[in-house]
Amino acid sequence: MVKISFQPAVAGIKGDKADKASASASASAPAPTPAAEILLTPAREERPPYQRYKKGGSVGGVCYLSMGMVVLLMGLVFASVYIYRYFFLAQLARDNFFHCGVLYEDSLSSQAHTRMELEEDVKIYLEENYERINVPVPQFGGGDPADIIHDFQRGLTAYHDISLDKCYVIELNTTIVLPPRNFWELLMNVKRGTYLPQTYIIQEEMVVTEHVSDKEALGSFIYHLCSGKDTYRLRRRATRRRINKREAKNCNAIRHFENTFVVETLICGVV
């Protein structure tokens, strides 16, 4: 706050008279009134005028915001793909892969009521509608190790006898082989246990007929299984007959299961 004072001016008196008059006046007159004062409040500091953003800066901010949103969305997309690939597909693959076994009475053996055990690895492809089975070397004999494909799209079954390293193809027998969905449900129901309930075994006999040169016509699944291997077509015998020892030497057996029972596939006339 600034204080400004004004002193009153004296006019019309000259010389000594003026001095005496002023002295007497000052002696007789009452005390002088205080000088007039004006109080001034200091002016507020002026603020700089509002600075408007330039047009170029506004556009740049929008661009940075857009780029940030794009990066965020891309991160969400990649995270979703990662979760889908490494968690969902992995879980789906585990649900479609089975390592299982079955206990059965071997009625085909010369020894009566022989209890046997068969293990196999099963992969079921529901969307492609085919099954792939791997039969390892049996612990107690009774068959050859093999890879088997049941292609329900083509209506074909392929056996890869690992001991002979040869492929054999025949029409799919739907009375024995469960479709992928049904087989998957069966294995899921018994997944809590290691083995299926004790069951029995049946036998089917097949005969080699001709060599297959065009493997691509068999479909991509069987082609990849039999590529680079001698491949032959099979014909199923309509009537069962007892096989003597001489004929048995020319037959190879593969034991497997795609149902609630075990199947022994005899492939005779092996080249």
Curated annotation (Swiss-Prot):
Residue numbers marked as site, Cleavage: R246, E247
Report which superkingdom the organism of origin falls in: Eukaryota
Listed PROSITE patterns: BRICHOS
One function term, GO molecular function aspect: amyloid-beta binding
Record membrane topology: Single-pass type II membrane protein
Q: Which InterPro entries match?
A: BRICHOS_dom, ITM2
- Give GO cellular component annotations, separated by semicolons: Golgi apparatus; lysosomal membrane; lysosome; plasma membrane
- Per the UniProt annotation, where are the glycans attached? N173
Q: Which residues carry this modification: Phosphothreonine?
A: T41
User: Subcellular location, in the record's words?
Assistant: Lysosome membrane; Cell membrane
Note one Pfam family from the annotation: BRICHOS
Entry's family note? Belongs to the ITM2 family.
Record text on subunit structure and interactions: Interacts with BACE1. Interacts with APP. Interacts with STMN2.
Provide the function of this protein.
Answer: Negative regulator of amyloid-beta peptide production. May inhibit the processing of APP by blocking its access to alpha- and beta-secretase. Binding to the beta-secretase-cleaved APP C-terminal fragment is negligible, suggesting that ITM2C is a poor gamma-secretase cleavage inhibitor. May play a role in TNF-induced cell death and neuronal differentiation.
Spell out the protein name for this chain.
Integral membrane protein 2C
| Gene expressing this chain | ITM2C
